[in-house]
Amino acid sequence: MSIGILGKKLGMSQFFDEQGKAVPVTLIEAGPCRITQLKSSETDGYQAVQIGFGEIREKLINKPAKGHLAKSGEDLVRHLCEYRVDDLDGIQLGGAVTVGDFAAGQKVDVSGDTMGRGFAGLQKRHGFSRGPMTHGSKNHRQPGSIGAGTTPGRIYPGKRMSGRYGGKKITTRGLTILKIDSERNLLVVKGSVPGKPGSLLNIRPANRVGAKPAKGGK
């Protein structure tokens, strides 16, 4: 049973399927993650499994986190993540979550922080068209009109303008696991995932499997 796992993005490559077609893939080093806490309905009001991933030096972790990990008898970890479960049977405190809990062909959702691009303009951030480059125009990469004058006399909230681009947590849904390498803790996932190489990823079973519903909910 796969509840979820934390991993590190290694980069992108290509994978050849049975027909010899090159498929773009992402290599993810996932786990092994130790189970650091079990939450039950009796003690916490819901059932969940908390896992830890990544090494950290003792001087860089605070006392509350150190005490929390000491209860489970686990080594210090850099990242903690919690997953809701319906049943805690067969899950033990101190156990390991590995890539072997997943299967080739399984659909997963991958969450991570997108690459930060700093302060960006309208063309790069929102894909706006630029202004004329010749004939005396000075409006090359400026936003142009951003609203009316007297009415409403203000800029509506949510207006697309320049600002910070990237560095947000997003989820890419319905990616397919093409291959699993248990010896090297690798997941080969079809397509791209958020973040740059070395960034933290959260991989969990897809909660939307199947064809998209038709418009109107029918």
Curated annotation (Swiss-Prot):
Residues 126-163 are annotated as: Disordered. The keyword Ribonucleoprotein applies. SUPFAM superfamilies: Translation proteins. Belongs to the universal ribosomal protein uL3 family. Part of the 50S ribosomal subunit. Forms a cluster with proteins L14 and L19. One of the primary rRNA binding proteins, it binds directly near the 3'-end of the 23S rRNA, where it nucleates assembly of the 50S subunit. This is Large ribosomal subunit protein uL3. It comes from Synechococcus sp. (strain CC9311). The lineage of its organism: Bacteria, Bacillati, Cyanobacteriota, Cyanophyceae, Synechococcales. The gene is rplC.
